[in-house]
Amino acid sequence: MPPTVSDTAPSAAPPAASPTVLTRPVRYPSDGGALLEHLTRAGQLRTTRNPADDNAAVRPVDCVLLESADITTKASRTTVAILESSARLTCWGGTVTAEALDAVDGQGPGADGLAALARLEESLAEHVTDRSPGRLTLTLPTSADDDPTLEERERLTALSTIEPLRVLAQAEVDHPHLPLEAGAFAFDYLSTFESLPEVAQGANTCPDYLFYDARIILVVDHPTREATLVGASVDTADLERRM
């Protein structure tokens, strides 16, 4: 079945403010992990392998798999998978690096990633410390650096390295599941909001956070056995081709 376009057509506003939304019902997958393995083998996801190991398996990158289950029956409820991301945001201390990702089968930063970077630069211009094609570096305060007498709510809502995620999450997209920023926080990220003792750097190279701005997601409702691809892009033709 071909994808369907949302009722809201793109306007003459800047592309970042009005992406086209497409949806497409797809065959129900009972196992999200197995599906990602299949898409990896089929070359439908970004992948990497260890260059130092000729026998290393190819593994997917720049995608996220989220699962929920009934706490009593353990039955699967919902799967949400980011299959294609427009941008990657990596936080180390007070520095956030935003990168526009290449199309899976294309060359150079994609239009949606560049639009995400433009949105960040417009909203957080005074915090931009470096820029290059397809890449933006921002330096932001941590509330733990400020007055330690601040109440917890004030620290959590103050300007911090979480702000780039907030900016992208507030984009106007005509679909209940988008925009979607998904990823992982390191435990050390707590030091953004609380003054903690210094800990020596170990072998773990996980950043304070690593998040992705979703371009194409799969939403699976396990009780109804329904699955839908949802995508949002300023490049409608490319989105139709990818979906």
Q: What is each stretch, according to the model?
A:
Residues 1-243:
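Signature of the chorismate-utilizing enzyme
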